[in-house]
């Protein structure tokens, strides 16, 4: 598993064919009421699916699942043996889809390239989706006997994944660090962390937790600030729930 191909769909949400999406849903969803409601919401969008809609995220993943299954189950080559028999061999070993980004991993450069071309063709012909032509074929990071890195890390989902460690993508790291440094200043003064800042800290914490960022977390008290941010959000949620309950009682 030394070779990877990475691509992404051009304007994925607006490009989704709603007619095909509905047909896919009709085949697999048997609840008529749920289908009716979902179709009404889909038809409320101007073109394709609406960017930012919570429903669109799920529908986009569902639509792209067809491409995932094609890549995971249909990408084979046939090898003919001397005795006349043929054998199907997988072109790739691993498939990863994350929203409109996808990654194919295999052992042979020619096989991974062929798999990528077949997947691009499938997505265009059967899903009406266009993969950006600048998709990348590269050798995955590996370490020689002297401990030197070669190839490229896998840059996906906000992480840069090396053979022996995982880093947070630089742009995300810098924004996350600013959020925690700012929240830390409020904590040092004994002040409550502003709600929007608390939400940002909670969102960024996942990247730091699931990467090799132990030094950063210790230096900037990330874990302690995260707990303070959680308590801040929890208190606010309780206030809203209590206010909502009072309004219901008043209405009754």
Residue ranges and their predicted role:
Residues 125-129:
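Flexible helix-coil linker/hinge segments at domain or subdomain boundaries
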């Amino acid at each position: 598993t030394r070779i990877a191909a990475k691509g992404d769909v051009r304007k994925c949400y607006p490009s989704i064919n709603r007619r095909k999406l509905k047909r896919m849903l009709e085949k697999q969803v048997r609840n008529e009421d749920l289908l009716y409601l979902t179709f009404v919401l889909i038809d409320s969008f101007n073109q394709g699916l609406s960017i930012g809609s919570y429903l669109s995220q799920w529908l986009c993943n569902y639509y792209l699942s067809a491409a995932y299954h094609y890549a995971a189950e249909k990408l084979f080559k046939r090898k003919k043996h001397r005795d006349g028999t043929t054998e199907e061999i997988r072109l790739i070993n691993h498939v990863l889809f994350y929203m409109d980004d996808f990654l194919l991993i295999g052992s042979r450069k020619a096989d991974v390239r062929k798999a990528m071309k077949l997947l691009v063709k499938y997505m265009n012909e059967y899903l009406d989706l266009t993969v950006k032509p600048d998709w990348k074929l590269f050798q995955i990071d590996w370490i020689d006997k002297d401990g030197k890195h070669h190839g490229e890390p896998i840059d996906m989902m906000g992480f840069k994944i090396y053979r022996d460690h995982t880093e947070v993508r630089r742009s995300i790291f810098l924004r996350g660090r600013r959020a925690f440094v700012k929240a830390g200043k409020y904590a040092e003064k004994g002040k409550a962390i502003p709600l929007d800042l608390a939400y940002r800290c909670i969102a960024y914490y996942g990247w730091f937790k699931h990467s090799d960022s132990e030094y950063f977390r210790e230096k900037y008290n990330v874990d302690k600030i995260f707990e303070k941010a959680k308590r801040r959000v929890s208190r606010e949620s309780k206030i809203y729930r209590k206010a909502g309950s009072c309004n219901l009682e008043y209405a009754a």
